[in-house]
């Protein structure tokens, strides 16, 4: 008996992007739906306390910035560390309007990054997403920030970690981890459909629990790389 495909299965990043394209062309607010789902999981993982959001370039960072804005509007103390010179403009503007302080990572030394982590109940990893086409390994400022936070999240009573779509540093399709400088997530909030890299390879252990936010993708023409219950 052929098992029907499920959006919880692990799909290739190219198939996800292809399924997103017609919705984006039609003006669908995929990022807002994704951000609302991310914020919902953040509340569940850390109902109170400060939130530290790590933001890189691209739409992954945009999702994280919009979620940061939503949490800040609810009265949460939210701080953003920007690891890239350019971040999602609309997301950054909305976060700033909500009172979120955005700091460039190169304005913070390792001790300052670690101190922000220790002061937080939750760290959100929004550095890299499925748009990464080269090696998933973190580099430069992103790698330095994550390295500074690793002992913080590993400590007793350290902050919870929520990854946005896929933990930064994990290969989207193969789950490869070419550099161990990866924040291990307690929960990965993935959008549209499961990513194969969350279900296989070293990435599986780093993803934690996978929470799927359905944004209405049509994946009927795509074949999963990994079955969720395999």
Q: Which positions does each model-derived feature cover?
A:
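Nucleotide and nucleotide-moiety/phosphate-recognizing core
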Residues: 36-129, 133-164
